[in-house]
């Protein structure tokens, strides 16, 4: 899914025009910052997105002050939209000095209030230099850019390099801050969400405990064999966004090749054939 994220820096944006003129799927809106700031455009934008049934999220820019107070301020503003949009903790700037123990306090307090585990947004370099081992049950949204050149229109497979360990993957990638779309005269953050609308709505509804991924089933294996989810890290991210354990899916595919020969060649669109092969695999 093609996503943009916006703040008051894009106050002049006409969401209706941008959606009408581009293959845009959804928007993440800045809601709050610190313990008192609220984006003056937040209510207008989110109300429009909600009314028009567009996928959306909302983020809190962490200032690194009182973690509980920041979570409470965020919740007080986004409360009407809980379970409708994805909540995000924007971990950058001054908050980085406080570290992930502080971040966990914010995340835990917001979850107490809302019942939803927020997504974590940060740069890939932060994931690689700080200890996120206690936070891997939160969905991850990374920022990593190939360069700072203008990007005209969305990219299907944005460049990404480097591990996100200890996370098993990420569900969204901000790949430029210099994106350009028809209907808006300015730079935009472009993001790729590795999932469909159902996966997005699942994250809104609190179904974002990534420790509860489903094992492989015939339908998801068939879709994977048909290359619906891409390859390598993109595939893992997409499967996780669909709610499936990518390791279970890959293990099943490996066993299918071992038992069934050239499964990808033979399987075609025949789900009954795949079911029969899976029955053999499970019987071993």
At which residue positions do the language-model features occur?
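Functionally critical loop-and-helix segments that line ligand-binding/catalytic clefts
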Residues: 1-10, 17, 21, 135-136, ...
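Substrate-binding cleft of extracellular glycoside hydrolase catalytic domains
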Residues: 1-116
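Sec/Tat-exported extracytoplasmic proteins
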Residues: 31, 50, 78-81, 110, ...
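Catalytic domains of cell-wall/extracellular-matrix polysaccharide-remodeling enzymes
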Residues: 85-160
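Extracytoplasmic Gram-positive cell-surface binding/anchoring modules and repeats
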Residues: 218, 225-236, 244-246
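Extracellular/secreted glycoprotein ectodomains characterized by long, lumenal stretches
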Residues: 220-225, 265, 269
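Repeat-associated, polar segments at repeat-unit boundaries in modular proteins
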Residues: 240-263
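Short, low-complexity, charged amphipathic interaction modules
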Residues: 263-284
